[in-house]
């Protein structure tokens, strides 16, 4: 994110929402199943994400230099752009050029520096925050549950000075399977419901230190087994709804 608004509570929430942006839509969870077999994981592959409601989010990603070593081990270059806005505020935009490595279902990202070196990515618009692959074991029935999780996002200090952001998700419970419309047509998908709490932290924008209050949301991930992906995430925070979904992939 190149510029961060600094006007009061909205700025604080915009900053944190930009970092969380769908916590389970592209890998904030430690284990990501099926990433190497995703529909876009090939040379020329593409994925597009769009958000609406309180959080407006867009991401256009292109995949190249893809290599697969079998199992859930692969590498790819990910290039594209992302933008995030909150409550009608102007979108913050970032250009992305990352090298992604997946080993045993866990993805890590490195940024290419001007001199050709690779530097680990810890924040900025971290692709692990986008989470299409958050369920590492098969979902087989209504009532199935997944344990609570805790993960930490380390903010890229080249973008903004901030303490690590701690995110906790409650126990996840699978609801009744339903047919929903996705970018890949009608799909029979499982709704997985849980709470997500972002712990209070603080951030410094251009030398101004702002406390960021804790935020709790009710979240529903729509996991579509035929695609092995979360294709849509719906969340509700203080009565305001947001949706982030995959709108295109090839």
Segment roles from a protein language model:
Residues 120-131, 184:
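Acidic/charged, solvent-exposed loop-and-adjacent secondary-structure segments enriched in E/D, K/R, S/T
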């Amino acid at each position: 994110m190149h510029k961060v608004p600094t006007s009061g509570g909205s700025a604080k929430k915009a900053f944190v929402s930009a970092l969380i942006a769908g916590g389970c839509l592209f890998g904030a969870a430690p284990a990501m199943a099926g990433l190497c077999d995703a529909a876009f994981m090939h040379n020329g592959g593409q994925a597009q994400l769009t958000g609406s409601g309180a959080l407006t989010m867009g991401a256009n990603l292109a995949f190249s230099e893809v290599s697969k070593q079998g199992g859930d081990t692969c590498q790819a270059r990910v290039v594209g752009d992302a933008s995030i806005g909150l409550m009608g505020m102007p979108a913050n935009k970032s250009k992305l050029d990352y090298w992604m490595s997946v080993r045993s279902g866990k993805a890590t990202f490195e940024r290419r520096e001007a001199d050709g070196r690779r530097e680990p990515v810890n924040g900025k618009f971290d692709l692990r925050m986008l989470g299409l692959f958050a369920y590492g074991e098969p979902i087989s029935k209504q009532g199935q549950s997944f344990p609570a999780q805790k993960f930490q996002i380390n903010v890229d200090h080249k973008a903004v000075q901030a303490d690590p952001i701690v995110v906790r998700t409650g126990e996840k419970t699978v609801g009744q399977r339903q047919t929903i419309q996705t970018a890949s047509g009608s799909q029979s998908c499982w709704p997985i419901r849980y709470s997500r709490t972002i712990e209070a932290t603080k951030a410094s924008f251009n030398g101004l230190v702002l406390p960021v209050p804790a935020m709790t949301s009710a979240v529903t991930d729509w996991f579509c087994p035929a695609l092995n992906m979360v294709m849509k995430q719906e969340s509700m925070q203080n009565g305001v709804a947001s949706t982030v979904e995959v709108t295109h992939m090839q």
